[in-house]
Amino acid sequence: MKKIFQLAIMACTALSVHATDYTRGLSIWFDTPNTLVNKAIWFGNTSDMWKGETKPESAGDTATNPDAGWESQSLPIGNGSLGANIMGSVEAERITFNEKTLWRGGPNTSAGAAAYWNVNKQSAHILDEIRQAFINGDEKRAMLLTQKNFNSEVPYESWKEKPFRFGNFTTMGEFYIETGLSTIGMSDYKRILSLDSALAIVQFNKDGVAYERNYFISYTNNVMTIRFKANKPGKQNLVFSYEPNPVSTGKMETNGNNGLVYTARLDNNQMEYVIRIHATAKGGTLSNQSGKLSVNGADEVIFLVTADTDYQINFNPDFNDPKAYVGVNPSETTATWMKDAAALGYDALFDAHYKDYASLFNRVSLSLNGSGKTDNIPTPQRLKNYRKGKPDFYLEELYYQFGRYLLIASSRPGNLPANLQGIWHNNVDGPWRVDYHNLSLIHI
């Protein structure tokens, strides 16, 4: 009887780490893991043509992202400044990382940025000629009239010019967390994005151990928090590493026995940025060597990540000043954020994060046809069924709420608005430079 009681306790303990079923709430989830096949996608393409840069990159200036898994199966999290995509592979977690103000390139004109504002203010009457050219089917004349009369002193840009005149949003690199595990013998895999709490979760069972990872980016503390845990002690054997943006030059330094600081500048415009990483472990050992944080035999591990650039928002810039948008010391800002976040710990960070996020997300609820969630299946299966004509009002509710989630995660007070991809990108360059556009009428 005593033995049966002990086995029952062990069984309950084995389930405790997965006690919360995040798929039951408003969530997007998958039941198969991703792989590392497209990690650091920029190294698999053509060489860069920008003057002074020789490192490999992919321009990615088409509508097709070369990393299809990142685009369709990763879990996006963000706080309006920092963004990350969680891939959720078992062998090694891959996290693409972004900071909204990291911008590659610039005006690229000897006259300076002010030249862009020197436009022909007496061009309205030319509109009649342009319209008539279109009516006559003379698109070439319409284009030439537009370029000549509705442009600044800076020559009209060519889509394929190198460097592109206005530059582009660019990745801040990728993080990898090697686990020493494999998918052999793995079961009950789930990769979940909880829209209710802006929390990403990875869960699976392996060799009788229930593993769980949690990820969120806090607006209140400007830090990404990552937690690895299991239902049995001593199971966390991890190596945390960083792959930097390939068109930047930087240096990784240790910060005590549990921290890393990467300081860099983009190669073409010298924008400075800093990334700070901090680790804490319950049990086991933690070492810091060769730009990597290694954990052995820990019960639980917390990684904190924050970043910043030298960009300063300026609503009244002097365009003759090349430093009009420079004014932040990213080494100082990131040090303050990291110190404050590390002092709080996981629970306090998540509580503040959830309270802030829920105050926005919970303003709106949506119920279509009084449906509710009638079945609990992975999101790809929902989409597959929907394409076959099966009604799914919950999927439509989820789609609407996912849009709200993405905007909250990519646009918050105190920073730039969301760009064409919100705040998330996995490459050096991207479709339409991942920049800022007014909405075209054809897209409405």
What are these regions (language model features)?
Residues 1-20:
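Bacterial Sec-dependent N-terminal signal peptides
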Residues 20-441:
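Aromatic-residue-lined binding/catalytic grooves and analogous aromatic/hydrophobic interfacial grooves
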